[in-house]
Every structure is written in C-alpha cells, then in structure tokens.
Amino acid sequence: MKRMLLFLLLACAGTSAFSQSQWYYYAEEFYFVKEVPVTAFRGKNFRYEIAVKASPADTLSKVRIHGINVGKGKEDFINSDFVLESRSEQEWTVYTLAGKIDENAFRLWFYSAVNGNGSFYFDDISFYVEMAPGQWKQVALPNYSFESNSKNIFDGYYVSKRASNTTVTQVSNTVYKTGNRSLQVTSKKQQPVSLLTTSQE
C-alpha cells in the first residue's frame, strides 16, 4: 500500500504545473481506498464516481482522487492512464475517473485523500462498466454511501492506519448527498511544508 501511495503522489506531482504557491504543500494525513474486483470486466471501459463537499481552510488544502489497475499481488501495480473530470451538483463536486480496465488487472483501487485543513464530506460512490458501445452497467459496491450498520464506518474500504491527533473521521447524519449519511473528515492544525529542500554532503 505504501508503494501505491508513493506512485500516485509522484504521478500527481508530475502532471501539475507549479505556481509560486505550489512550492508548498500539506503532507498527506488521511486516505481511504475502495477496491473493485474486475476480472470479469478486463479490457472494458469504466467510470468511477465519488461526490465530495469540501470546505478547505486555505488554498493549499484539498482533496485528491486517484485510481490504479492492480494485478494479482497487493503491490502488483499496473501503469494506468485514467482521466479525472469533475462537475458540480448543488453544493457537491462529483469527481469521475474514467479509463480502461487492464487485461491483467484483478482489481481497481480508487484512492481518496485529504491534504491540509478543513471539513470534507464524501458520499455516493458508484462504478460503471461499458458492456457494449454506449451501454453502461452499474456494478453494486458495498457501503457505497457510508450507510452500513457496521460499527466500522470504513467497512468495505482500506484506510490509512497512521495515528493522527489533527484529523477526525466520523459519519455525518446532517450533511449527505444521497441516503442519510456521509463520511466526514475534519483536519486542523496541519502546517504546510516546502517542496524545496537543501542537503549537504
């Protein structure tokens, strides 16, 4: 999992143009991953969607959404050229990752992370496969809207195990896009760090 995070972060950094403010960033404090088995859909196009309502505390704080094809092993990561798009629906931003399921993939990992400070809500995760040209099928996902009755609010997800006294995760019963609940992530007191480092030999 750690290698996956490094790969995704490097990929994100490599595709971003730096402004002066982007020489600073927040270290990643929290993430969760939805795994989707895909052996039955190899070679087909897919769409993955997640709704986010973000109230960042500053311009550097943000949500990051990524995805990757994964082979048989847990660290068997396959180069994945997915496209990320977004649209607004009321007070929510719906992020869509689209691409093709690799012929050697056993699963897709979809990764959501919070960098920085603020309140962030996640809800209404969905996954679609193009079974024939123009014919999309929605594939059921467990706990897609954080409505599970399990005491584990991350039932059906991988989640960062890093302990933090600056980040709180909980289910919100007051802010949600569909159903009656969403995942709320509240982060505070984090400090940005510089991308520029100086080393001496």
Predicted regions and their residues:
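Bacterial Sec-dependent N-terminal signal peptides
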Residues: 1-22
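Extracellular and organelle-lumenal recognition/adhesion modules and their flexible linkers in secreted
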Residues: 18-201
